[in-house]
Amino acid sequence: MSCRPHPASRGILLDRRRFLAGAGAAFVAGLGTHSAAALERADALFGASCRRPDGSYGCAIFSERGEIVSTVSLPDRGHDVAYDPVRRRAVVFARRPRTFAIVFDPVSGETLQTLTSIEGRHFFGHGFFSPDGALMYATENDYDAAHGVIGVYDVAAGYRRIGEFDSHGMDTHEAL
């Protein structure tokens, strides 16, 4: 998923599997000391959750050339990344049935906040922001009722969960 599209490109989408294959190889090669230079040359940034060689989990931000810009550590396996273009923050969501989402600076890799799903819910790994950046939406599972919901979060209030709506399905995965 594009994190910072070039103004002329209107966003760049890559086939996830092809991107992850290349991104994984670049990540295993290790973090370079030239991430600032990679950022300056980048027209777009991409995020991917990964398992590191030591078995720990992380999320890496890459340029379209495959250069690592930043990484953030995750407590468990992550899935997808959403980007807030207003605040220039990213959120990586836990892969189901995990309950965390990490808000971070995609340029520095600094963790800014850790979110936890409410009781009775887990994240399905995806989310997105409203066009004005005021709200974040996350795909979630209401496992007692066995159906999917979209959780609604107030970004300005520290990502406070303010509601939800039914996704009309059991396994809400990606939402656009």
Outline where the language-model segments fall.
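N-terminal secretory signal peptides and thylakoid transit peptides that target proteins
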Residues: 3-26
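C-terminal segment of N-terminal export signals and the immediately downstream linker at the start
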Residues: 13, 31-62
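Short, solvent-exposed loop/turn segments at conserved positions within beta-propeller repeat blades
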Residues: 52-55, 95-97, 143-148
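Short loop/turn segments that connect beta-strands within beta-propeller blades
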Residues: 63-65, 106-108, 155-158
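A short beta-strand motif characteristic of beta-propeller blades
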Residues: 67-73, 110-117, 160-165
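Repeated scaffold domains used in trafficking and secretory/extracellular systems
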Residues: 76-82, 122-126, 170-174
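Residue-level detector of Asp-centered blade-edge/turn motifs that repeat once per structural unit
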Residues: 85-86, 131-132
